[in-house]
C-alpha cells in the first residue's frame, strides 16, 4: 500500500524527499477532503443524536458500575429475620383507603386507633393520647406530621381536616372543603394538601385566615394518596381510578397537570419519591394490579416495572443504600410477596429479601428521622419496628418483641 502511494505521489508531484513524502502521507490518512481530522469510531448520526448516544452510553456505564458496586456491597445483605419491636395497636382499622401512621422529625410515631390518635416515643416508650373523637360516625382516617413536628394534620371520616398542636394537645383550627372521607393529608412547608373520597385535592395555606388556595378535581374516583417531592416542589396523586397525576406547585389547576400516568390497573395508594433522584417516583398498584413501577416524572415515562402479584399498600425508600421497601396485602398466584415486606435493589428492582409472611396485610409504612428504621402497621393490629435500612447500634440493647408487646399492652392504649 505504501509503495503504491509513493508511486502515486512521484507520478503527480515528481520526486519527493522522505520528509515531504511523510507529510503528504499523513495528511491523506488523517484529514478529510475539507482538511478536517477524521473522527474514529464515532456514531455517524446528527450532532444531536450523537450527544444523546454518548449520554446514554455514559448512563449505562454508570448504571453498570452502580449495579456492580451494589452487588459487591450487598453480598451479605439480607432482610432482618425478625422485627426489633412489636407494639400492640388495638382498633387499627383494616382499611386500604386510610393513611394513619407517620414517624415525625421529632422522633414520635403518630397512629390512629379507632376514634383516638396516639403518639409513641421510641426513646422512652412514652405514650400520649392526642385526641379522641366523641362521635360514632367520625374517626381519624389520615394523618401527617408537619416538617417541624410541632403540628399534626388529621383528616376525618366526616370530611374535616384538623390541625393539632402536638405539644399542648390543643386543636389549632379546622379546615373545610371536602364532602367526604379525607383519605390522605400531606405537608409542603406551610401548604397542607388533602385528598378525599369526594375526588378532590385541596391546598390550604395554614398561615392564612382564608386558607383554601387551590381546589382540584380530576380523579374520577376517590383520591388514595398524595406525596410532595421535597426537592422539586412536585406533587403526585394516586387515585382509585387507577391513575397517577403529576402536578407542578406553581401551575396547579384542574386543567393544568404535568402528566397523567395510566399504566396501573387498580387503585394507586403507594407512592414514594426517590431520595437520590428527584425525577424518579415509585408507585404501587392495588389487588388487581400488583405492579411496582418507577417513573421519570420530567418525561412522563415508566422506566421500570415489576409484578409482585400482591396488593402494594405502601413504599419507603432507603436513604442510605439504593433500595426500596414495599409493604403488601392480598396476593394471588405463585408469589412470595403477599402480606409481607419486600426489599428491592434500585434501579434493577431485583429482590433482596423479605419478611416472613403474615396472616394479615401490611397497610402502612413510615421511617425514622435518621432513615435507619421502618415502622409497619398491619391489619393484625400491631406495629412492628424493623432495623432494615441500617445496622443496629453496637451498644444499643435490643428489646425482644415479646417484651415490647407486653409493655405496650399494659399501656393506656389498650
Identify what each model region corresponds to.
Residues 1-63, 67-70, 75, 302-313, ...:
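Terminal intrinsically disordered, low-complexity extensions flanking WD-repeat/beta-propeller proteins
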Residues 100-106, 143-149, 155, 185-191, ...:
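Loop/turn segments within WD40 beta-propeller blades
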Residues 117-122, 155, 161-165, 185, ...:
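WD40-repeat beta-propellers
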Residues 90-95, 133-140, 176-182, 216-223, ...:
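WD40/WD-repeat beta-propeller blade N-cap
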Residues 84, 128-130, 170-173, 211-214, ...:
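A structural motif specific to WD40 beta-propellers
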Residues 112-114, 155-158, 195-198, 231, ...:
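Conserved strand-to-loop turn within each blade of WD40 beta-propeller repeats
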Residues 75-94, 124:
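A short helix->beta-strand "capping" segment at the edge of beta-propeller domains
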Residues 97, 139, 148, 171, ...:
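WD40/WD-repeat beta-propeller blade-loop signature
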